[in-house]
């Protein structure tokens, strides 16, 4: 990206914001396929340093902690892990680590350690300076204008998360800002935000054309690009529940704020498919211990990370 002197500084901010957004997107839409085993490992153990720590555990301690986790996943204590039990556990794990990460971020953003994060503190942490855009004045430069819109959107979300209208966000409000999908009072705001961005004709719905954004069909092409076919399939089969060719506010929600349920269910089914030796569509402790590495390279143990977090392997959860 080439920027003139006037836009260089803000261009760097835009790159930072884009990188941050990409990180969030990757959390929600982790690629499958060739990286399947890596995805499994991170789901159970976490990042590479957690995997390394797991390896350092003695075999007996590894098995002891793994058995403790298996016992907790088995909600009805029947000795088997079903798809539902695995999915519920993985979703709980996602939420636990998201909350832990938000708590760590809160400390970093709270520059004066007063247990609140102000908008200025958020800006300083994100961009090393306080940024203030005029909401009603568009910028001529396309990149500057793109960043202005992104920044104003974050500001509105920050203000919505601030329930008590105090000088900044408490920890709970900061979690609502970072993870609106986990907080009920943010739902309506997120939907309205999506409508403002995508509902071009103002009818209160998002059509397929609006869903696809700026894509224009190429009359010289024999068929649509593969990514368009995928997006159309998602629109029809995943989001448009009443099959009326448009997304109403409630149908918008799983698109704009996807939760982890689908990811967790897919991972649970993957584990059962790979580890179920007798074809009963569930996993016994024996089947898991027959191939523990696969289980420890999956979301079920956050890629083994849970073996180092006593929140998961201690008796009281």
From Swiss-Prot:
Keyword Metal-binding in record: yes
UniProt note on tissues of expression: Ubiquitous.
Binding residues for Ca(2+) 4: 199, 201, 203, 210
InterPro entries: EF-hand-dom_pair (IPR011992), EF_Hand_1_Ca_BS (IPR018247), EF_hand_dom (IPR002048)
Keywords: Calcium, Endoplasmic reticulum, Metal-binding, Phosphoprotein, Repeat, Signal
Keyword Signal attributed: yes
Amino acids binding Ca(2+) 1: 74, 76, 78, 85
Cleaved signal peptide residues: 1-22
Chain residues that bind Ca(2+) 5: 240, 242, 244, 246, 251
Binding site for Ca(2+) 2: 110, 112, 114, 116, 121
Binding-site residues for Ca(2+) 6, renumbered to this chain: 276, 278, 280, 282, 287
Sites where the protein binds Ca(2+) 3: 164, 173
Cellular component GO terms, alphabetical: endoplasmic reticulum; endoplasmic reticulum lumen; nucleolus
Compartment annotation: Endoplasmic reticulum lumen
Family: Belongs to the CREC family.
Reported function: Not known. Binds calcium.
Name of the protein this chain belongs to: Reticulocalbin-2
Source species of the chain: Homo sapiens
Phylogenetic classification of the source organism: Eukaryota, Metazoa, Chordata, Craniata, Vertebrata
């Amino acid at each position: 990206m080439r920027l003139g002197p006037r836009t260089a500084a803000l261009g760097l901010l835009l790159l930072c914001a884009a990188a941050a957004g990409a990180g969030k997107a990757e959390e929600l839409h982790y690629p499958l396929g060739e990286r399947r085993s890596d995805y499994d490992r991170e789901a159970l153990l976490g990042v590479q340093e957690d995997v390394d720590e797991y390896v350092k555990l003695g075999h007996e301690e590894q098995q002891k902690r793994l058995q403790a986790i298996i016992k907790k996943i088995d909600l009805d204590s029947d000795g088997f892990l079903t798809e539902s039990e695995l999915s519920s556990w993985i979703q709980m794990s996602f939420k636990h680590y998201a909350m832990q990460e938000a708590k760590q971020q809160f400390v970093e953003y709270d520059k004066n350690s007063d247990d609140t994060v102000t908008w200025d503190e958020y800006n300083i942490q994100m961009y090393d300076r306080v940024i203030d855009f005029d909401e009603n004045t568009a910028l001529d430069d396309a990149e500057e204008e793109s960043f202005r819109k992104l920044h104003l959107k974050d500001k509105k979300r920050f203000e919505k998360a601030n329930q008590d209208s105090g000088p900044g966000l408490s920890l709970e409000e900061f979690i609502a800002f970072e993870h609106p999908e986990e907080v009920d009072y943010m739902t309506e705001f997120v939907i309205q935000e999506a409508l403002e961005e995508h509902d071009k004709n103002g009818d209160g719905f998002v059509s397929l054309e609006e869903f696809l954004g700026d894509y224009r069909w190429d009359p010289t092409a024999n068929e649509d690009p593969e990514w368009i076919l995928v997006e159309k399939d998602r629109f029809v089969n995943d989001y448009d529940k009443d099959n009326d060719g448009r997304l109403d506010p409630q149908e918008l929600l799983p698109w704009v704020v996807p939760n982890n349920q689908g990811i967790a269910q897919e991972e649970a089914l993957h584990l059962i498919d790979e580890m179920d030796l007798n074809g009963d569509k569930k996993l016994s402790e024996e089947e898991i211990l027959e191939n523990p590495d696969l289980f420890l390279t999956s979301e079920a143990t956050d890629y083994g990370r849970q073996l180092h977090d006593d929140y998961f392997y201690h008796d009281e959860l």
